[in-house]
């Protein structure tokens, strides 16, 4: 099931695909209108692709997508589909990763097998991942993106950046650049 929250102001809209992180994690986006999409079933947004597309079609002034892990997958997918700038932390780019047992269920419920592999994704993509995490490096290397390495081996590079006091600067720099 898809849950949507929003904080609308005037001006550009950031679409944030949430994979379990609370909205306050994205505090550095508060100067923008924000739409938060939550994949409450942890299925890489696969059950809701058509609903998300209809919803995004109705939002003017979309400028960027943002997400972490499976939210990063969705940020890349919908950023590509809508020609938006993307900031993704440790995203999956193929729905074939044995680290998450739910990924098999995501493939089973999806109506869009063409999105199981995002190697076709192009655009203005910025991806962060921990440099000592070979699986995340493999995912990131499959797409066209500006790559940033984070010290560490964890999967969640955004949490690592937050613990280092750097996440706010990363998000601010991304959201305030063209």
What is the predicted role of each segment?
Residues 77-81:
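Active-site signature of alpha/beta-hydrolase-fold catalytic machinery across serine-
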Residues 102-178:
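The feature captures the conserved acid-bearing segment of alpha/beta-hydrolase catalytic domains
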Residues 30-31, 82, 143:
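Short, structured coil segments at secondary-structure junctions
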Residues 87-98:
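Active-site nucleophile loop of the alpha/beta-hydrolase fold
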Residues 2-59:
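Active-site catalytic motif of lipid deacylating hydrolases and related acyltransferases
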Residues 67-71, 75:
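Gly/Ala-rich beta-loop-alpha elbow adjacent to hydrolase catalytic centers
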């Amino acid at each position: 099931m898809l849950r949507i929250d929003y904080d609308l102001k005037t001006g550009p809209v950031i679409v944030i695909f949430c994979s379990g992180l609370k909205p306050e994690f994205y505090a550095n986006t508060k100067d923008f209108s924000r739409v938060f999409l939550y994949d409450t079933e942890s299925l890489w947004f696969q059950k809701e692709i058509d609903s998300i597309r209809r919803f995004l079609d109705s939002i003017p002034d979309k400028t960027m997508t943002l997400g972490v892990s499976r939210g990063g997958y969705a940020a890349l997918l919908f950023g590509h589909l809508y020609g938006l700038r993307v900031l993704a932390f440790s995203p999956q780019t193929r729905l074939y990763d044995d680290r998450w047992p739910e990924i098999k269920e995501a493939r089973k419920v999806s109506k869009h097998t063409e999105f199981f592999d995002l190697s076709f994704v192009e655009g203005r993509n910025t991806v962060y991942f921990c440099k000592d995490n070979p699986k995340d490096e493999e995912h990131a290397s499959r797409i066209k993106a500006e790559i940033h390495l984070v010290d560490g081996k964890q999967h969640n590079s955004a949490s690592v950046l937050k613990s280092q006091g750097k996440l706010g600067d990363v998000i601010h720099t991304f959201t305030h650049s063209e």
